[in-house]
Amino acid sequence: MHVLYSTSAHILPSGRHINVARTPWLRLDIVSIIGILLHSGPIAGFSINMIIFRDAFIPLTKVIENKKMNNIISYSYIYIYIYICHITVENPGDITDKHYTRMNVSHYYIIT
């Protein structure tokens, strides 16, 4: 298991892209996510303490752009576990594709 640590990320619902610090834009196939775990927290508009994406796929062509990861790429698609904390929506009253969801990523696991 190879672990990368990040502090912030952005996700655009329509494009399903997530930008993790020190990594390039990685496209996530949200449909391929097998499980999502939500931990309850104080909801003021829209906020989530933690969300876990399991078994999401990232295309190799996007990942290979990051030279730091070149040595761990061994498959055309790799499994990714993302642990995301403190998600807040820019405009809680109108969650649409026009708005970005800002989040902090506590751990970023690359499993090859």
From Swiss-Prot:
Membrane topology, record value: Multi-pass membrane protein
Transmembrane segments: 33-53, 69-89
Recorded GO CC terms: membrane
Subcellular location as annotated: Membrane
Alphabetically ordered keywords of this record: Membrane, Transmembrane, Transmembrane helix
Domain of life: Eukaryota
Protein name: Putative uncharacterized protein YOL166C
Species: Saccharomyces cerevisiae (strain ATCC 204508 / S288c)
Lineage: Eukaryota, Fungi, Dikarya, Ascomycota, Saccharomycotina
